[in-house]
């Protein structure tokens, strides 16, 4: 059975090299230690386009990349603080009398607490 997989893999390698040879696309090597096709579909993605843009020169691409990185860092920081914030809100909600609570706020606090616990469980499962 194992030899069938080896034969199948060899056939796929031969077939893919023949298809690549027939396609006629010229591959260009960039300084990223990988070879990419000039018309690759991945180039249409915004992050890849910003990284390898040949048409846009100057600070426009850098500004967009910095905005994305700032937003990503803000989101990550918020996710890291979410469990602590939920715990503080949970403690505060216990100290307030039930008659003084607004039902909507109590529900939001409870949802945040459960979301924080779910995040912690996911992180511990990944480890």
From Swiss-Prot:
Record's keyword annotation contains Secreted: yes
Intervals of motif RxLR-dEER: 48-65
Signal peptide location: 1-21
Cellular component GO terms held in the UniProt record: extracellular region; host cell cytoplasm; host cell nucleus
Subcellular localization, as worded in the UniProt entry: Secreted; Host nucleus; Host cytoplasm
UniProt keyword terms in alphabetical order: Host cytoplasm, Host nucleus, Secreted, Signal, Virulence
Functional description taken from the UniProt entry: Secreted effector that completely suppresses the host cell death induced by cell death-inducing proteins.
Family: Belongs to the RxLR effector family.
Comment block on domains: The RxLR-dEER motif acts to carry the protein into the host cell cytoplasm through binding to cell surface phosphatidylinositol-3-phosphate.
Name assigned to this protein: Secreted RxLR effector protein 7
């Amino acid at each position: 059975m194992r030899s069938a997989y080896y034969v199948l893999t060899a056939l796929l390698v031969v077939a893919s090299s023949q298809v690549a040879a027939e396609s006629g696309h010229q591959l260009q090597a960039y300084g990223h230690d990988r070879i990419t096709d000039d018309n690759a579909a991945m180039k249409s993605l915004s992050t890849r386009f910003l990284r390898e843009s040949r048409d846009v020169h100057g600070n426009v691409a850098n500004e967009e990349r910095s905005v994305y990185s700032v937003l990503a860092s803000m989101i990550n920081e918020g996710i890291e603080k979410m469990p602590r914030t939920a715990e503080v809100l949970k403690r505060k909600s216990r100290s307030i009398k039930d008659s003084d609570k607004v039902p909507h706020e109590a529900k939001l606090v409870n949802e945040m607490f459960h979301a924080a616990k779910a995040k912690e469980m996911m992180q511990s499962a990944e480890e």
